[in-house]
Amino acid sequence: MVTKRSLLKLYLLGIVTLGIYFIYWLVMVKRELNSLGANIPTCWLLIIPIANIYWLYKFAEGFVKVLKPGESAVLYFLLFWLVSIIMPAIVQSELNKLAERGG
């Protein structure tokens, strides 16, 4: 089940909690993507240096597999890594579209 979330609320809570809400959001989105068929590893890899780069690649790969089939996982990985502030907006927008369709 995909949850529709407000982008404004996502960013405001992320700023107010100094980024802690973004980590919580990543955990919740990872669960949703995995329930839709992605294969994203445990979020504990987020706190391990170097392993967090691998985790972000696997997240981008799962995002593309579930929500953007036919597009490049490497492109989304680079986008998420280099311009990470827009990553929640891209991912949540796609999840919101899926939630509106009833996915």
Swiss-Prot record:
Segments passing through the bilayer: 10-28, 35-57, 72-91
Topology with respect to the bilayer: Multi-pass membrane protein
Principal localisation: membrane
GO annotation, cellular component aspect: plasma membrane
Coiled-coil regions listed in the entry: none
Keywords recorded for this protein, A-Z: Cell membrane, Membrane, Transmembrane, Transmembrane helix
Domain of life, source organism: Archaea
The protein's name: Uncharacterized protein AF_1598
Pfam family, one: DUF4234
Protein localization: Cell membrane
